[in-house]
Regions:
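Generic alpha-helical secondary structure signal
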Residues: 29, 59, 120-124, 210, ...
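Short gly/ser/thr-rich secondary-structure transition/capping motifs
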Residues: 67-74, 134-138, 199-202
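Short Gly/charged-rich anion-binding patches and loops
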Residues: 59-60, 96, 121, 142-143, ...
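A generic structural signal for well-ordered alpha-helical segments
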Residues: 64-65, 126, 147, 180
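Catalytic core of membrane glycerolipid acyltransferases/transacylases, capturing the structured
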Residues: 34-55, 66-67, 82-136
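A generic structural signal for alpha->beta connector loops
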Residues: 69-71, 107, 128, 151, ...
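Membrane-anchoring hydrophobic helices of lipid-metabolizing enzymes
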Residues: 1-86
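Non-catalytic C-terminal accessory region of glycerolipid acyltransferases
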Residues: 4, 109, 138-277
Length: 277
């Protein structure tokens, strides 16, 4: 009986959280977004909006922990606060990944699906925060580089959608690599795990696990894109002994492959993925 009551409470609390999230998003889009555009200074307006989002998600994560829906274990959170503008590259096991990362990163911008620009709960948020749409690959890189130059960390899930299975990732797209190369900024790999699985691609919001789910976040050491490309490239260089820089396309492809392999390997090393499954 106690277990059933606990399950029912967590189901109710989860539903309440989604309602609060949706209502607050709608109110933000309808009220705060129009008012924000009255603010004359664009840079300070964006800073104000992203700060509000950061603290709202911090409160939401704290609420989910307080009501017993989730637990959160973070290693290396200081890097998200203190590294300066970087490209955060993370795997994407659950719907809450972006909520957690925005709660941990004070000055952050996201690459988000173009569909959110028409979503009544999100259209105002993504515009006021000047998040970057994935609709146009070229503009995605240009806009992300501008955000980094303005002092924001870019949060990117290169799988493009939530992971297909607990022990498997989608292939990484190259957008994050082009951004890191254009902005000449480090990549900060982040590992995310959710146990038991919750809010995956295959689950509905009401598919509450049998116990509180635990999200683990491990922030790895930053990776210098140019150094990684040089390391991954051919050591021989050109016939005359010089080392020619690879084309942007080849550099992005090399960087994407290396970071994807790095994150996959670390997911096994840290026990987020289980060998043999």
């Amino acid at each position: 009986m106690k277990a059933r009551l606990n399950y029912g409470w967590r189901l109710l609390a989860t539903g309440m959280s989604f309602v609060v999230f949706g209502v607050c998003g709608l109110l933000f889009s309808v009220l705060v977004f129009p008012l924000a555009w009255l603010w004359p200074h664009r840079a300070s307006r964006q800073r104000m909006v992203t700060t509000i989002i950061h603290w709202f998600f911090r409160a939401l994560v704290a609420f989910l922990q307080w009501v017993g829906v989730m637990e959160l274990d973070v290693a290396g959170a200081a890097a998200l606060r203190d590294s300066g503008p970087v490209v955060v590259v993370a795997n994407h096991p659950t719907y809450l990944d972006v909520v957690v990362l925005l709660a941990l990163t004070p000055s952050a911008c996201c690459v988000v699906k173009n569909a959110h620009w028409g979503n009544p709960c999100f259209w105002g948020i993504v515009r006021a925060a000047e998040y970057v749409s994935n609709a146009d690959p070229v503009e995605l890189v240009e806009a992300s580089a501008r955000q980094i130059a303005a002092g924001y960390t870019m949060i990117i899930f290169p799988e493009g959608t939530r992971s297909p299975a607990p022990n498997r990732l989608h292939a990484f797209s190259r957008g994050f690599a082009h951004i890191a190369l254009k902005a000449a900024t480090p990549i900060l790999p982040v590992l995310i795990d959710c146990d038991p699985p919750a809010f995956t691609k295959q689950m509905r919001w009401y598919d509450v696990p049998s116990r509180a789910f635990r999200i683990r976040v491990s922030v790895l050491e930053p990776v210098a894109a140019d150094q990684l490309i040089a390391h991954e490239g051919s050591p021989e260089g050109s016939p005359d002994g010089s080392h020619e820089s690879p084309s942007p396309a080849l550099a992005a492809r090399t960087l994407t492959s290396a970071i994807e392999a790095h994150i996959n390997q670390r997911l096994f090393d840290y026990g987020f993925f289980e060998t043999g499954n």
